[in-house]
Amino acid sequence: VALGFEGGLRPGNLLYLNRGDLGFPRDQGGATRALFVVLRHSKTRERRDAARYQHVRITCATVAALLDRAFGQRDRAAALFSWPGNHAARSRQMSARFAAGLRALGVPYGQAQGYTLGGLRGGGITAYFEATGDLQLTRWRGRWDSMRSMEHYIQELASHEAFARLPPPARARIFRLAGLLGLFVQP
């Protein structure tokens, strides 16, 4: 969830990632504090005018530390999400686990009234824009050629409003869980 949100990734991007696609600062000789995520299976990779590989730069130290703890010691060829089955079966498994996590928090899930795995990209991009106020940086983060595509994401999603509409017990559980993050990672 943290990788999808912070990186503005599509669910399909997540399923194709392996450990070697995560460039932790130590992998780069400590020359940077950022985590780089290489997308070898991006949505636009087949277009002639598109880059073969795309990348995302994650600068949030807490998210980078969390991902390092979860995936950093794995073999570089190991899939990050190695559930059995074909791509469609793995996608269903990821969605089911995401839904189970939301249910445990009391957060609505589903297209009709709640959050979906696909919303991590839009929510992350919107949060990034709200934090930076910079359209060009946001466009780079979302990997869009067109400003118009980016505008749809930013105009349609108001993540702070969605959070405010959650039931108070769900918001309280989320804050408690967020407060525990520091026990698991040290940025």
Label for each model-derived stretch:
Residues 3, 8, 14, 39, ...:
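Mobile genetic element proteins and their domesticated derivatives, centered on retroelements
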Residues 3, 90, 117-118:
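Residue-level marker of regulatory loop/turn positions in helix-turn-helix DNA-binding domains and
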Residues 3-33, 134-140:
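Short, charged phosphate-coordinating catalytic segments
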Residues 11-12, 22-25, 45-48, 88-91, ...:
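Eukaryotic short linear interaction motifs
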Residues 25, 29-86, 97-101, 105:
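Basic, alpha-helical nucleic-acid-contacting "clamp/cap" segments
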Residues 95-140, 159:
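Short, basic (Lys/Arg/His-rich) helix/loop patches that form interaction surfaces
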Residues 142-169:
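Catalytic-site neighborhood detector that most strongly recognizes the C-terminal catalytic loop/helix
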Residues 167-187:
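C-terminal secondary-structure termini that scaffold catalytic or DNA-interacting sites
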